[in-house]
Amino acid sequence: MEKMRGKRIRPRDSGELVEDGRSESERKTRKKENDVVSKGRIGRGRGRGEVSKRSIEIDISNPEKDIKPDGSRKCLGSTCHHCKILTSESDLIFCSKCNKKCYCFDCIKRSYSERTHEEVRAACPFCMMTCICRACLRLPLVIKPPSEKDTDVKLKQLQYLLVKVLPVLKDIYTEQNRELEIESTIRGHPVTEANIKRCKLDPSERIYCDLCRTSIANFHRSCPNKNCSVDICLSCCKELSEGFHQERDGKKNAEGKGYECRIPAGQGKDSDAYVPLHFSTWKLNSDSSIPCPPKECGGCGTSTLELRRLWKRDWVEKLITNAEKCTLNFRPTDVDIVHECSSCSTNSDSIRRQAAFRKNAHDNFLYSPNAVDLAEDDIAHFQFHWMKAEPVIVRNVLEKTSGLSWEPMVMWRACREMDPKRKGTEEETTKVKALDCLDWCEVEINLHQFFEGYLEGRMHKNGWPEMLKLKDWPPSDLFEKRLPRHNAEFIAALPFFDYTDPKSGILNLATRFPEGSLKPDLGPKTYIAYGFHEELNRGDSVTKLHCDISDAVNVLTHTAKVEIPPVKYQNIKVHQKKYAEAMLQKQQYSGQVKEASELENKSMKEVDESKKDLKDKAANEEQSNNSSRPSGSGEAEKVIISKEDNPTQPAVSTSVESIQEQKLDAPKETDGNTNERSKAVHGGAVWDIFRREDVPKLIQFLKRHEHEFRHFNNEPLESVIHPIHDQTMFLSDSQKKQLKEEFDIEPWTFEQHLGEAVFIPAGCPHQVRNRQSCIKVALDFVAPESVEECLRLTQEFRRLPKDHSSSEDKLELKKIALYAASSAIREVKGLMQSSRRSDT
């Protein structure tokens, strides 16, 4: 999706092509590109091997030797479908299914090594839809539509959706009625929606609040001046009328109490420069109307903002009335979400996985079915856990697909073939941007080097593992266009299709935007990154702690285990020990920044004396505050870490010895019944997902210890706006243990294996660490069970500073709820009418 600039957005023409700058002669004489596939002896994930170009020499100097005794001409050979090279028939395997395609031994060995010659002869890769030759990668892949649902089942699902969406519709209606009352006071007479001027937008346009960047769904206040186009959402209007903005600004938004509102200055709406808006100069008029912001803040400063609507009058009220009528006789299934799932406890060995060790808890085990065994009625089982906002892990989802290769270079070649801006350059010169997890800085690297490191590993000059994450490749809004076959393969792998189908999922609210309207970018999106089997505690390949505004499903499609030679491994251990010692020294002074800065100007003797005093002081405070810590006081405590201090307290375990014991030993197999989850092996990535109800305590812990986290250039965090939404913190194993000791909360922790789909509920903070090089593909969706949580998160995100990476309302939840209700009501009415006709 095009980056938003200003307040109203029009998408680029989807068919627009950009000239690549080459002349016609250059296009005709472009050198044929090599058919390259990455080395596959290490990678896992549907396709391995490398393709090499072969040529076959055919002697045509003596044409008579090609004539058979009976006078017929010998067949010189056939063309391999994959490499398109003329090959002797003795080196080819012909498909007995289609009787058309054939593959040479070399291509089978290098590109389809997971299949035997007999399997290829029975059904070739082309027939199996797994061929990765250039021609096949360009072919459009038709996705088989899901079977038509039973009318009664579909009706109940739509009614279920309406029941879940109704509370959001009522919130929108209440908010609009409140603004109508204010407008009545301003005008001095009763005002209805018929009296409110309608602002019509093109279906491909969006309108955003100029204060909080929230998408405007219907009612808003707008400047009537033709030369000014300031728009403000109802939430900001409410806060302005209550004096909220005059009291709150600056860093107070880090605590969720307000935000420093910013609007464009200088060049007007299209300016990238934002200045703080001081509300002391922007006050309500005496009649409670809101004046347009002053010129220095992007407005005209002369007009009064007028109430506007985007839709037909009384549309929201009619939606509520119709939704209530459609669900009048609907009775949702009674679900006991307080106790443990009876289905999981009955089939404990096959469909659940232990992910936490909380005492007296019913949610330590996660629902983890096998995709191959899923039946249609399992959707109710999924709903039970989704209502409780519990993650779900579905195993073996790739078994439902055709088996198309997810090798990184196969994906790259497919992406290149579909690129309209393709210039014909060789892959060795193709540059991409990646993030170095050591300092979180952007680096430029060519694709071959990146993917070689993906398979074989990369090291910094000092021997420390280099962990890179490919940044936005292919672009998230182009995944379906650039990788159509991989997109179809991913969609086919998704379980619980009613929720996850991005086009027509009946319980995916995000699918119900009107045709031609500008839809939010919900993926699919690829995440390609290196990994290391142990936690390094420095420069790990991680996705830092964050919270998604919508539900999401993440599928691990490919892994590659990098083998580290013993000599290099020992070198890593040496560097780990040195780093742990250095960190230990720094942490001994990090309890109070003020005291530490004063110590910097003292002599070494004074430093040593002060160091001892600080240790004693911290030890006394720790002993006296042990009982009060779980209460979650907002004051930061002095935490001094040392191997000699308080050895019986396991909350702090960052000494050199403990780090060596926990992180440097080779991982061992675990049966999952002991609290050694970080030592489990063979998984591609380790997930930590926190419960929604634990978020307040988690935030308190992060604020208390924010000085212990590092981000850019591996330096301590300079400022924290929001400890979760900033996405700058990652909890190590020792910090998770400390969190458990101080606040008695722990995440669900589990490993994601190849072919597993992880479902993450909206509002659950989570973090991920790669244990191997991984390719993951993720998709966002909006489930009926999560719609109220999504709305709450929207309100939380809008309080962030305007230049914050999470402040933009990318989901447009209110629009989604309105469109979903409108669409579902139409379908329910149609089904009910059809049912009446059939009865008569």
UniProtKB/Swiss-Prot annotation:
- In which residue ranges is the amino acid composition biased (Basic and acidic residues)? 11-38, 595-620, 635-646, 660-678
Q: What is the effect of changing H546A?
A: Impaired H3K9me1/2 demethylase activity
Q: What is its EC number?
A: 1.14.11.65
Tissues/organs with expression: Expressed in seedlings, inflorescences, flowers and siliques, and, at low levels, in roots, leaves (including vascular bundles) and stems. Particularly observed in stomatal guard cells.
- List compositional bias (Polar residues) regions by residue number: 621-631, 647-659
Q: Which cysteines are joined by disulfide bonds?
A: none
| Annotated stretches, region: Disordered | 1-52, 594-678
The UniProt keywords, alphabetically, are: Cytoplasm, Iron, Metal-binding, Nucleus, Oxidoreductase, Plant defense, Stress response, Zinc, Zinc-finger
Q: How is the cofactor bound?
A: Binds 1 Fe(2+) ion per subunit.
Gene Ontology biological-process entries: defense response to bacterium; epigenetic regulation of gene expression; positive regulation of response to water deprivation; regulation of photoperiodism, flowering; regulation of stomatal closure; response to bacterium; response to water deprivation
> Where, per UniProt, does this protein localize?
Nucleus; Cytoplasm
Q: Which SMART domains match?
A: JmjC
Q: Which GO terms describe its cellular component?
A: cytoplasm; nucleus
Q: What does this protein do?
A: Histone demethylase that demethylates 'Lys-9' (H3K9me) of histone H3 with a specific activity for H3K9me1 and H3K9me2. No activity on H3K4, H3K27, H3K36, H3R2 and H4R3 methyl marks, but weak activity on H3K9me3. Involved in regulation of gene expression. Regulates flowering time by repressing the major flowering regulator CONSTANS (CO) and promoting FLOWERING LOCUS C (FLC). Exhibits a positive impact on abscisic acid- (ABA), hydrogen peroxide- (H(2)O(2)) and calcium- (Ca(2+)) induced stomatal closure.
Q: How does it assemble?
A: Interacts with RPN1A.
Name the UniProt record assigns to this protein: Lysine-specific demethylase JMJ27
